[in-house]
Structure formats: C-alpha cells, structure tokens
A protein has these predicted regions:
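Conserved GNAT acetyl-CoA-binding A-motif
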Residues: 90-103
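Conserved acetyl-CoA-binding loop-helix of GNAT-fold acetyltransferases
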Residues: 75-88, 113
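Acidic/histidine-enriched, beta-strand-rich ligand/metal-binding domains
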Residues: 73-74, 97
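Short glycine/proline-centered loop/turn elements that form peptide/ligand docking sites
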Residues: 79, 83, 104-107, 124-130
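Acetyl-CoA-dependent GNAT
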Residues: 2-65, 70, 105, 124, ...
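Conserved catalytic-core motifs of GNAT/GCN5-like acyltransferases
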Residues: 99-101, 117-133
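Conserved active-site tyrosine of GNAT-family acetyltransferases
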Residues: 18, 111, 116
C-alpha cells in the first residue's frame, strides 16, 4: 500500500529519487534541460569570495538563485555589474531570457534598472512584503 512519510530530515537518496524522477519526466516531456551552474564571484584582495551571483542556465533561460553584494560595496552598481556578467555568459550559452525573484525593495529597483520586468507577485511572502518575479529578454549568441 502507498503511504506518505512527512519528514524534515530526508536523506540524500530520498531527495535524489524525487529529483531523478522529475528530471526523467521533464526530459521525456520537453527535452533535456542542459542545466549548467553559473556563478560570478566577487573576491577580496586575498582571493576570498565575499559575494557574487549564482544560479544556473536551463532550457534557454538564466535563473539567478542568489545575489549578494557586501555592505562595503553597495551603492556602486555592483548588482548590475554582476547581472551583466551572468547575462553575458547566459547569452553565450544560447539563453533567450533571464528570471529572478526577490522580496527586497532595493533589489527590486536594482533589477528593474537592469531591464527586468515584473511578471508575478506573491503577496505576504514574507509577511508584510511581496515576493516579485522578474524576467528579462536576452539575445542569444
């Protein structure tokens, strides 16, 4: 008999079963994702990573999962420079678009300055804020 097991401590193999199953389904449904990690790192004088942007490209799109600029570098256009570098690599990989989400008002404005447009909003995530989903058209090379 099929059963559900609710847990906050799934094993790596349990998570892999879900991921591998969905990946196989999606590959059959729409073709391989050709998913590749993408990161643009900010390093200090000693070479230590202190910030940057990370995400991946898949199905012709760049998804930015994380973008962090250290406080000492904020207000200098760093977020835009990071996005431009990630977008250039995504275009070189043949991507036609990019998407990102945020619930931070300053980040929202920064992304909009870079040409991203809101295509969705999730109100009260987190409470008192909205989570915005943004996209931008890229020019694949």
């Amino acid at each position: 008999m099929t059963q559900f097991d609710v847990t906050d401590t799934p094993s790596e193999s349990e998570l892999a079963a879900i991921s591998e199953g969905l990946t196989a389904f999606n590959t059959t449904d729409v073709g391989p994702s050709r998913r590749r990690p993408l990161a643009v790192l900010i390093r200090d004088e000693s070479g230590k990573t202190i910030g940057g942007v990370s995400g991946y490209t898949a199905w012709g799109w760049l998804f930015t999962a994380w973008l962090f600029v250290p406080e000492t570098l904020r207000g200098q256009g760093m977020a835009g420079k990071l996005l431009e570098a990630a977008e250039a690599e995504a275009e070189a990989r043949g991507c036609q678009g990019a998407w990102i989400d945020t619930f931070n008002p300053q980040a929202l404005r920064a992304y909009q300055r870079q040409g991203y447009a809101v295509f969705g909003e999730l109100p009260d995530f987190p409470a008192g804020r909205s989570r915005f989903f943004l996209q931008k058209k890229l020019s694949p090379r």
